[in-house]
Design a protein with these regions (language model features):
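Non-heme Fe(II)-dependent double-stranded beta-helix
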Residues: 2-72, 79-171
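Non-heme Fe(II)/2-oxoglutarate
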Residues: 2-24, 42-48, 52-55, 214-217, ...
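Short catalytic/ligand-binding loop motif for oxyanion handling, primarily in non-cytosolic enzymes
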Residues: 86-88, 194, 208-209, 270-272, ...
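Short acidic/polar capping segments at secondary-structure boundaries
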Residues: 156-165, 178, 189-193, 204-207
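Histidine-centered catalytic micro-motifs
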Residues: 170-177, 268-271
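Short, conserved beta-strand element in jelly-roll/cupin
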Residues: 177-193, 254-255, 262, 286-289
Length: 343
């Protein structure tokens, strides 16, 4: 064994019991031999079993109707989520006060991120962040994720300029990873059927025998997949193949402003394709933690000093990489209004 492999092997082996999903960057996770013996199948089955136990502990603190909605569909939709006054304040603030922003291009879509304040500076944005990490919302996001924990909401703008020669990878149905995980969007404006709304295959958060078999089959070839997202563990699936899983229909979710959508993105989902140029703004966050740990919460990222500054540090690190000649996928674009068109 080469010295470099001797160093990498124990690190890659330890990551079997982690949220690591990348078949191409981890020789153990990507080993067709080990996956033929059942490694990926085991990771999927065990992570879902552990998530079910953690969800059972969180369920009593949730609204019963939202538990039912999630179990049936894999997502929760809550309209009129923010208090009306706070909603109006944050929309007005984002329209009139520019914030530091970072942008990423994927295909013909631009994603702009603006971190919310990690401390109370008197702004509506800081108040929204506090609301989104209150115990009730935290429990809901943790339940959907299969493990409660800390998360850091950001203002996210999606600017879509349709271009058939440069497709948006988020328009393809996919699962984010192999275990339950949560993303949420608090939409600040109406999102119509032709404005790229969120779509989800109803019930696809459930690990059916057919889905487990499919995960196994994908794992055998994933490390050599031409699609980089597929090789990284975010498996793509065609609409034509959905019938084999025993799930429900592909549901599109146009929503009115001030709607919160929380989804388990182990389920198949996408940004609905549109040929209409659009710009939409939302508050977005994700919660993805080690799926093998038996408890909810109790994570280093939740230490107040760390939690309140994590996003600030992350974006500072991205800027530092860029200055060192290693540009990050997100580039600093200076001060922007949330709804500014992309450069």
């Amino acid at each position: 064994m080469k010295p470099s492999r001797m160093i990498a092997f124990p690190i890659e082996a330890a990551r079997v019991l982690s949220s690591d999903k990348n078949f191409r960057n981890n020789a153990i996770l990507g080993s067709s031999k080990l996956n033929r013996m059942g490694l990926h199948r085991w990771r999927v089955a065990q992570s879902h079993a552990a998530s079910a136990r953690r969800r059972a502990a969180l369920a009593p603190s949730l609204r019963p109707e939202e538990v039912h909605q999630f179990e049936a569909n894999g997502f929760v939709v809550r309209q009129n989520a923010l208090p009306t006054d706070l909603f109006r304040r944050v929309v007005d603030e984002l329209e009139t006060i520019p914030r530091q922003a970072w942008e990423m291009r994927q295909g013909h879509a631009i994603t702009r991120l603006m971190p919310l304040p990690g401390h109370d500076d008197g702004s509506a944005a800081a108040a929204v962040r506090r609301w989104l990490i209150e115990p009730e919302i935290r429990a809901l996001v943790g339940y959907v994720s299969g493990r409660a924990g800390g998360y850091n909401p950001v203002v996210q703008t999606i600017a879509n300029r349709p271009d058939p020669t440069n497709p948006d990878p988020q328009n393809t149905l996919h699962a984010d990873t192999y275990h339950p995980t949560a993303k949420f969007w608090l939409f600040l404006h109406d999102v119509g059927p032709d404005e790229g709304p969120f779509s989800y295959v109803a019930g696809s958060h459930r690990l059916t025998p057919e889905r487990l078999d499919w995960e196994y089959e994908q794992s055998l070839l994933a490390s050599d997949a031409k699609n980089a997202h597929h090789a990284s563990g975010s498996f793509r699936v065609s609409e034509a193949d959905l019938g084999v899983f025993g799930y429900g229909e592909l549901v599109t979710l146009p929503v009115p402003a001030n709607t919160l959508v929380v989804a388990d993105t182990f389920g198949f989902h996408r940004r609905t394709p549109t040929d209409k140029p659009t710009v939409r703004t939302e508050i977005h966050a994700m919660l993805r933690r080690n799926p093998f740990l038996p408890w909810n919460g109790v994570d280093v990222s939740e230490i107040p000093f760390i939690h309140d500054r994590a996003l600030e540090w992350r974006f500072q690190y991205r800027d530092w990489k860029t200055r060192r000649g290693k540009p990050d996928k997100y580039r600093n674009v200076g001060l922007r209004f949330a709804a500014d068109p992309a450069d």
